[in-house]
Amino acid sequence: HVRSRRQRQMCIRDSYRNTNYVPMGFAYDYYLTQTEYEETAKATRANLLMRALVLTDEDAAVYGKYLTHLPEGRREELYYESYVQDCRERRATAASVFQMNNSGFHAEITLEKENLVFFSVPYDDGFTAYVNGQEADIVEVDEGLMAVLCPAGENSIDFVYQPDGIRLSRALTLGGIVVWLAYTAYFVWRKRRTKRA
């Protein structure tokens, strides 16, 4: 049986399609503390991360009221079938819009209740988050990723990235240009003065 090039490409594409794909920016129903997460078997942690958001003990005290603490029984049933269900549940809470831009990314999400919205983007001090135009705290979750608290209803989320030290480097560059211009102007003035004399 001979296949056309297009049929082969479609077959290959379908072979590598992730049917459990979850878009960027979604909410959880459950949370787990970092301590509890570290006590679970390493082999099941990936599945657990699709079921519950991992918060530090300190962040759990602040943000735990927006989520339900994952019961111990739900920490054990981490089979492929339950993973598929967890992916389906995360997809149902996912952002309707996610766009990368030159300074970071933008997302839009509608929430039934106030909740943390998770982004699988590495946490970095250079990020500033804005929820509905207001600056918001970024929570470091899941061992180094980011989440931001959003109110119930429609939300517009922007993460703006500015590398650490960029303000200082811009100020130094601008200062250097000013010094260079003054230095150049001095020599031009001196040269003209010497020619007149």
Q: Predicted segment positions?
A:
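Short, well-ordered beta-strand micro-motif
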Residues: S15-R17, L149
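Catalytic cores of secreted or luminal carbohydrate-active enzymes
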Residues: R17-D86
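Active-site-proximal, structured, solvent-exposed surfaces of multi-pass membrane proteins
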Residues: A60-A61, Y66-A197
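Single conserved hydrophobic/aromatic residue that forms the stacking wall/gate
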Residues: H1-I12
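Aromatic side chains
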Residues: S4, Y16, F26, Y123, ...
